Curated annotation (Swiss-Prot):
Cellular localisation: Nucleus; Cytoplasm
Gene Ontology BP terms: alternative mRNA splicing, via spliceosome; cell differentiation; sex determination; sex differentiation
Assembly behavior: Part of a complex containing fl(2)d, Sxl and vir. Interacts with nito. Interacts with Unr; cooperates with Sxl to prevent translation of msl-2 transcripts. Interacts with how; promoting nuclear retention of msl-2 transcripts.
Lineage: Eukaryota, Metazoa, Ecdysozoa, Arthropoda, Hexapoda
Keywords: Cytoplasm, Differentiation, Nucleus, Repeat, RNA-binding, Sexual differentiation, Transcription, Transcription regulation
RRM domain sequence ranges: 127-205, 213-293
Expressed in which tissues: The embryo-specific isoform is not expressed in the pole cells, which are the progenitors of the germline.
GO cellular component, as recorded: cytoplasm; nucleus; ribonucleoprotein complex
UniProt keyword Nucleotide-binding, yes or no: no
UniProt protein name: Protein sex-lethal
GO molecular function: mRNA binding
Length: 354
């Protein structure tokens, strides 16, 4: 149907639809183009236009055989295996200075709406990534083009309000291999896209599997770096995510960090080995505990400051009988109102009514 049956046609896609063909788009301009026009992200499109899917792993014939090519090819045609290295070379200079101000002109595959795309709940956390702090006007196609330069992707979607299409500012990107997901975190985490600094990390599954894996660490050296934090805590397990808290004005470390491990046992081992231990270059023993315990202690301290009794406090004494009567029979009435009521209702037996 889409083959090169017309002698004057330039469609050499081997049976694939023409580049940019979108059956579900109904002819809208967004679905009819395989590349992003300048300023495209400023246009308003419906959620149907911005949500799309790509061929599943079972339907692909090769690494880069998406319709319309794959990867970021600025000024070049994506889609060949030889072009992957060039695409990465095009991306790395942009990320070296933590700036990616413009994503227009990227080579993208055609897309269409797919309501059956299942994201983080069915995929391994070793390949599924969560991308936070996305620009409000960033589209799924831009996000796909950005991450497709790293490697082949199973699914890619920005989470939106299903009625209005409003972006919630985060997305899930699922790679086909663990190596590509690791490289995506290393290359794309922290880059700036339209004045927004992206945060790329593994998407964590819900439930019991992630309980007691996040550590709250204090008394770290004020010169601590990410590499030094990896050296200290990486001995005890696989670190999924880490965050050194910094002063908002100076940008220097505050001596506090969060470290999340892949398994609960790894976090417990780190607590046993590092709590009350002075690290290299430090002057105080570390305080390492579960982040949940820190949150509970902080909440209890705040509640005590504002005068809210704790959960273990004894219950207040019961009200006196006249107040109980007032609350049960004539709630909100004054004593005069009660007397007036009794005069106008001489046969009303309050005790019997109660």
């Amino acid at each position: 149907m889409y083959g090169n049956n017309n002698p004057g046609s330039n469609n050499n896609n081997g049976g694939y639809p023409p580049y940019g063909y979108n059956k579900s788009s109904g002819g809208r301009g967004f679905g009819m183009s395989h590349s992003l026009p300048s300023g495209m992200s400023r246009y308003a499109f419906s959620p149907q236009d911005t949500e799309f899917s790509f061929p599943s792993s079972s339907s692909r014939r090769g690494y880069n055989e998406f319709p319309g090519g794959g990867g970021i090819g600025i000024g070049a045609n994506g889609g060949s295996a030889n072009n992957l290295g060039g695409n990465m070379c095009n991306l790395l200079p942009m990320t070296s200075n933590n700036s990616l101000s413009n994503l227009c002109g990227l080579s993208l595959g055609s897309g269409g709406s797919d309501d059956h795309m299942m994201m983080h709940d069915q995929r391994s956390s070793n390949t599924n990534l969560i991308v936070n702090y996305l620009p409000q006007d960033m589209t799924d196609r831009e996000l796909y083009a950005l991450f497709r330069a790293i490697g082949p992707i199973n699914t890619c979607r920005i989470m939106r309000d299903y009625k209005t299409g409003y972006s919630f500012g985060y997305a899930f990107v699922d790679f086909t291999s663990e190596m590509d997901s690791q490289r995506a975190i290393k290359v794309l985490n922290g880059i700036t896209v339209r004045n927004k600094r992206l945060k790329v990390s593994y998407a964590r599954p819900g439930g019991e599997s992630i309980k007691d894996t996040n550590l709250y660490v204090t008394n770290l050296p004020r010169t601590i770096t990410d590499d030094q934090l990896d050296t200290i805590f990486g001995k005890y397990g696989s670190i999924v995510q880490k965050n050194i808290l910094r002063d908002k004005l100076t940008g220097r470390p505050r001596g506090v960090a969060f470290v999340r491990y892949n398994k609960r046992e790894e976090a417990q081992e780190a607590i046993s080995a590092l709590n009350n231990v002075i690290p290299e270059g430090g002057s105080q023993p570390l305080s390492v505990r579960l982040a949940q315990e820190h949150g509970k202690a902080k909440a209890a301290h705040f509640m005590s400051q504002i005068g809210v009794p704790s959960a273990n406090a004894p219950p207040p004494p019961p009200p006196p009988p006249h107040m109980a009567f007032n609350n049960m029979v004539h709630r909100g009435r004054s004593i005069k109102s009660q007397q007036r009521f009794q005069k106008t209702h001489p046969y009303f037996d309050a005790q019997k009514f109660i």
